[in-house]
A protein has these predicted regions:
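Beta-strand scaffold of nucleotide-dependent catalytic cores
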Residues: 86-89, 128, 136-153
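Active-site loop ensemble at the mouth of alpha/beta enzyme cores that anchors a bound cofactor
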Residues: 97-114
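A long amphipathic alpha-helix within ATP-dependent nucleotide-binding catalytic cores
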Residues: 121-124, 129-130, 141, 158-200
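Short, conserved beta-strand/beta-arch hydrophobic-aromatic motifs that form part
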Residues: 71
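Conserved N-proximal alpha/beta basic substrate-recognition cap immediately N-terminal to
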Residues: 1-62
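Phosphate-interacting basic helix/loop segments used at nucleotide- and nucleic-acid interfaces
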Residues: 68
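Short, solvent-exposed loop/turn segments at secondary-structure junctions
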Residues: 2, 42-43, 92-93, 132-133, ...
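ATP-grasp fold ATP-binding core
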Residues: 53-57, 64, 75, 79-97, ...
Length: 200
């Protein structure tokens, strides 16, 4: 997404950001006659984690017990229930820190790690029961054809939470094969079927 140049006065930043966003999204409409593997609206929807969870259920995949909320009382009750839990932001985010780029990852969360209520209420988050993984699969669908890789996340540093944390340790990946029972539903055009990250 385009960012507002630092030269812009603080009073004008919101307006400039709106203009940049409008131009960015309108730009896609200039290529209506082009062949898209993923049309803009589908690619955008694919980045929405709530949409991904709904799509997973639609095609018959099981998802962990999930709470999406910014209500501190609900969040604390969920985290204090039986089992281990994780937190995911609704979107990915990159930022500069001490001269290097870092990003958001899935994180383990406990009642002790939760911030004060005012911070919990500031923005919604995705809270889920932690599911032990044998491996993770990254799948790309192109119509009825799919290609995927099996990531042995349990061998990676931090891989029990998010394979990307230790992705530098990946030497090779085997092909991922999906169960035949899920293929008819997963190969249908769902509007945002660019890729499906499936935890197994």
């Amino acid at each position: 997404m385009p960012e507002v140049p630092k030269v812009i006065d603080v009073r004008d930043r919101q307006f400039v950001q709106m203009e940049l966003d409008a131009a960015f999204h309108a730009h896609k409409s200039l290529f209506r006659k082009a062949f898209w593997i993923n049309k803009g609206i589908s690619a955008d929807a694919c980045e929405l984690k709530i949409h991904q969870l709904l799509m997973a259920q639609t095609v018959g995949l099981l998802i962990p017990r999930t709470l999406i909320s910014n209500k501190p009382k609900e969040i604390r009750a969920f985290i204090e229930s039986t089992g281990e839990h994780i937190y995911k932001p609704l979107t990915g985010y990159l930022w500069q820190e001490q001269g290097s780029v870092t990003q958001t990852f899935t994180a383990k969360v406990t009642a002790e790690l939760l911030p004060e209520n005012s911070l919990l209420a500031a923005t919604p988050g995705i809270f889920q029961t932690k599911v032990p993984k044998k491996y993770e699969a990254r799948i790309q669908f192109f119509g009825r054809f799919y290609g995927g890789v099996r990531i042995e996340s349990h061998t990676l540093s931090g891989g029990d939470l998010d394979w990307r944390i230790g992705q530098g340790g990946i030497k090779a990946c085997a092909p991922a094969v999906l169960p035949r029972r899920n293929l008819p539903q997963m190969s249908q055009p769902h509007g945002a079927a660019r890729h499906c990250q499936w935890r197994i």
